[in-house]
Amino acid sequence: MTHSLTFYHFGRALVLSLVWLLASCGGGGGSSNTPPSPAVTVPPGANVQALRVGPGPAGSGRVVNLLYTSVRLCVPGSSTNCQTIDNVLVDTGSAGSLPLPLVKVADQQLYNCVQFIDQSYMWGPVATADVYLGGTALDGEKAASLRIQLAGTTGAATAPSVCASTGFTPITAVSDLGANGILGIGPDREDCGIDCEFITNNGYYHVDQGGGDLTGIAISRAEQLLQPVTRFAANNNGTLISLPAVPSTGAASATGALIFGIGTQANNAPGTVSKMAPNPSGYFATTFDGRTL
C-alpha cells in the first residue's frame, strides 16, 4: 500500500547556503521501460515552488532520494542582474558568476561555518542577495537583501580549526554535496541565534583580519543567515511539502511542491492534521522498527 506524503512545517526556519561553483546541469537518462514519474496536483499560485526527487547535477554521485528545487538570486535591488540556480537541495541549508556583494564588518570580510551531522562542513564568505522563490518564473515570493553563505569560493580564507574539526570533511564541490546548494528547513529563524550575539568564539562567524588571519566575532540575530520565508511580505508563517505516492517497485523520479504559508491561501489550508512540536533543539521523538528515535 502506498501513501502520498504531506509535511507541514509551522514556523520552521529556512537558511539558504549556496555552493559557488560553475557546474553543468542535468541528469542521466532512463530506459524505455522506466515507470512513469509520480506527481501531485497542486493549485497554482505565487506561493508554490516546484520540487523534484531524481538525479542530481552532472558530476554528482549522491542521487538517491534527494529532494531538489530551483532558486533565483539577484543582486540586491536589481530585477535583471539575476541567475537561477537549479538542483538546489531541500533539507530540514553554484551561483556561477553572479557578482553578489560580500558582507564586511569594520572593513573585514565576514565568513560563516556550518557543520552537519555526517561530519562534513561548509565554509565560505557571507554575501547579500535578493532571493526569489515560488511562482512559475520564480518571481512569486521575495526575500530582499538576504545574507547567504557562498561555499567553495575561490580565494576564500582557509576554514579555521573550530570549523574544520578533526575528522570533518569539507564540502567544496558539487560532487561532495550532490547539489548546487542547500535550501534548509530547520527549527530556528537564524542559523545560530542568541549565542552568536554574545559569544565571540561561537564557531559560526569569523572575520578575516588580513592574510587569512581569522578571528571569531559576535553577530546580532538580524545580521545572521536568516530564513527566507520569514522575509516574505505574505505567506511567511510556515511551509508545506507535498510529495506523491510512489509504488513499492520505486520510480525513476517524482515531482511535488513546496508551498509557502500555512492557512494563508486556499492551497495551503492544513485541514485536519496531527501537530508535533519540536523541543528547543528542533527535534521530536518517533518510533521506527520498534525503536524510539
Predicted segment positions?
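Bacterial N-terminal signal peptides that target proteins for export
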Residues: 2-15
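Bacterial Sec-dependent N-terminal signal peptides
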Residues: 18-46
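Residue-level signal for helical boundary/lining positions with a hydrophobic bias
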Residues: 20, 87-89, 180
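Aspartyl protease catalytic domain
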Residues: 37-65, 144-150, 157-293
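Signature of the N-terminal lobe/flap region of pepsin-like aspartyl proteases
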Residues: 63, 74, 79-85, 90-162
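A short acidic-Thr-Gly-centered motif at the start of a beta-strand
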Residues: 68-83, 283-293
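Short acidic-hydrophobic surface loop/beta-edge motif
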Residues: 71, 127-131, 241, 286
